[in-house]
């Protein structure tokens, strides 16, 4: 029995959800690899190229709380002089999102996109996993380029906020 089978030996529903994630990534033509984490959760990693960025999709099934998370790190960070204001920029973007959110680590300036889906009373299918991938890359393309321009100092916070307000 491999480590993935061991991780889900007490929760066949979690195993089914993880298999669905892996199948969806395979059907999207994405190269993936899987890991078992120390907390008993399992993770599938897949690289993807969006319109603007090279990204790594990280799906994690946390069987302890019946939850799938998708986390995607943006391939840039906010430099130290802009870190406090980058928090305001990320908050402004989050107000525009209807699903998922951007997270920001002020300590190192990293920005992530996160989506979560509970599977306690739900049937998770490949279409739902593909939709999570598409939504994540769409929101990252739409707002990630704006966040990168802000972090690089191309636009001021005021210009960034006006652009977000005007164009969404």
Could you say what each language-model-derived stretch is?
Residues 1-56:
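Charge-rich, low-complexity N-terminal segments
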Residues 47-83:
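Long, continuous compositionally biased terminal/linker segments
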Residues 73-110:
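Short, internal acidic amphipathic alpha-helical interface segments
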Residues 83, 89, 117, 123, ...:
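Long, contiguous binding/interaction regions
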Residues 98-101, 143-155:
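Long, hydrophobic, amphipathic alpha-helical segments used as structural scaffolds
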Residues 148-168:
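Short, highly charged C-terminal tails/helix-capping segments
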């Amino acid at each position: 029995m491999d480590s993935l089978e061991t991780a889900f030996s007490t929760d066949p529903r979690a195993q089914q959800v993880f298999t669905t994630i892996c199948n969806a990534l395979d059907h999207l033509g994405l190269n993936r690899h899987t890991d078992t984490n120390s907390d008993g959760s399992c993770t599938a990693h897949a690289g993807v190229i969006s319109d603007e960025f090279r990204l790594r999709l990280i799906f994690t099934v946390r069987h302890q709380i019946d939850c799938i998370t998708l986390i995607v790190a943006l391939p840039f960070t906010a430099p130290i002089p802009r870190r406090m204001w980058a928090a305001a920029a990320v908050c402004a973007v989050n107000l525009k999102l209807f699903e998922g959110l951007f997270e920001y680590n002020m300590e190192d300036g990293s920005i992530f996109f996160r989506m979560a889906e509970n599977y306690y009373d739900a049937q998770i299918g490949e279409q739902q996993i593909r939709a999570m991938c598409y939504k994540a890359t769409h929101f990252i393309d739409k707002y990630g380029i704006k966040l990168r321009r802000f972090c690089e100092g191309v636009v001021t916070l005021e210009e960034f906020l006006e652009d977000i307000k005007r164009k969404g």
